[in-house]
């Protein structure tokens, strides 16, 4: 997207929305807080460096407002995508943090993992701040929902939150960490519903449920089953970025598309909670790295995504999402992307 002016950004947003409509999509999930920052006017977080190249620098217009206007004028929903804990993924991303980035304002809330900086999920004040950010979004913008990515705990290292764990008196570190994450997700859900009960709140966890439970400490099975006043999410959209027949080096095919989707669908789920599936558009032409012989070739057919969508329909899935836009509309393999788009459109716009 071109952030050089509101006019340029609006033109890009209009093209983006038209493109999404052309393949039958009904919702755009737009990243608005990738690094403890904001692609919108916020009193809590600095402007994202993605707008101007410098975190904290005002681009002179409100990108989120433009995206909402362009989406809604075409009948598309728009959800605001938030990374709740991440402040920095590497020394160069973002290249420099604004003075009012939480890493500078509240360093006691922040933990370093490699070159990355993250809010410590065990610190309630940090979680409360994230929830305040969610409330700010739904109170100030006509978004249709809030979407959390899969990044929760940045490491399994017990040293990360050892002091908080010791002070808690809890006996099981993994269970305690899952409680911390669930408390944040539940509070974010409730903040969304407090603003408007018709708004959606969802999470896109990793496609491997074991990783969710034991590495990210996201209790996805409990979230799916919770209902009523205990509801935690309106939907989950696990990232199923593997093809059919996907095989690990061990020979396991658990994560092959045709196996892992039914595994998720078999999980007990509250009637009010939807289950969608994220599909890996970025795999087009690249492959998924599986040990199976067709781990790349099946992603070079021009219809890989459409075949997965057909399979999801036959299994009764609630919906699907594509990651990510550029892979279909700004691809380095335009002929292959064109074919994938045409195959999707034939399914969704017929």
Language model region names:
Residues 1-10, 68-69, 79-140:
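Active-site-adjacent "subsite" loops/lids of carbohydrate-active enzymes
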């Amino acid at each position: 997207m071109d952030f050089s002016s509101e006019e340029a950004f609006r033109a890009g947003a209009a093209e983006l929305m038209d493109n999404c409509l052309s393949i039958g999509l009904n919702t755009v999930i737009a990243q608005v807080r990738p690094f403890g920052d904001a692609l919108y006017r916020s009193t809590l977080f600095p402007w994202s460096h993605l707008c101007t190249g410098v975190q904290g620098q005002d681009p002179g217009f409100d990108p989120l407002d433009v995206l909402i206007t362009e989406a809604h004028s075409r009948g598309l929903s728009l959800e605001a995508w938030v990374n709740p804990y991440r402040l920095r993924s590497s020394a160069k991303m973002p290249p420099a943090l604004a003075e009012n980035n939480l890493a500078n304002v509240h360093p006691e809330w922040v933990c370093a993992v490699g070159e990355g900086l993250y809010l410590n999920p065990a610190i309630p004040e940090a979680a409360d701040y994230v929830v305040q950010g969610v409330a700010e979004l739904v109170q100030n913008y006509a978004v249709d929902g809030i979407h959390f990515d899969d990044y929760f705990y940045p490491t399994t290292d017990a040293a990360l939150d050892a002091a908080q764990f010791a002070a808690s008196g809890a006996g099981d570190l993994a269970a305690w960490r899952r409680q911390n994450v669930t408390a944040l997700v539940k509070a974010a859900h409730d903040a969304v519903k407090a603003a408007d009960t018709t708004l959606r709140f969802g999470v896109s966890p990793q496609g491997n449920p074991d990783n969710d439970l034991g590495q990210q400490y996201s209790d996805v099975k409990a979230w799916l089953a919770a209902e009523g006043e205990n509801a935690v999410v309106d939907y989950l959209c696990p990232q199923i970025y593997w093809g059919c027949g996907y095989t690990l080096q061990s020979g396991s095919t658990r994560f092959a598309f045709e196996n892992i989707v039914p595994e998720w669908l078999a999980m007990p789920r509250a009637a009010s909670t939807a289950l969608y599936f994220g599909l890996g558009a970025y795999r087009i032409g690249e492959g998924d790295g599986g040990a199976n012989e067709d781990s790349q070739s099946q992603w070079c057919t021009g219809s890989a995504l459409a075949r997965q969508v057909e399979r999801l329909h036959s299994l009764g899935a609630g919906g699907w999402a594509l990651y990510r836009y550029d892979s279909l509309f700004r691809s380095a393999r335009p002929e292959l992307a064109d074919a994938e788009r045409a195959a999707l459109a034939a399914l969704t716009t017929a």
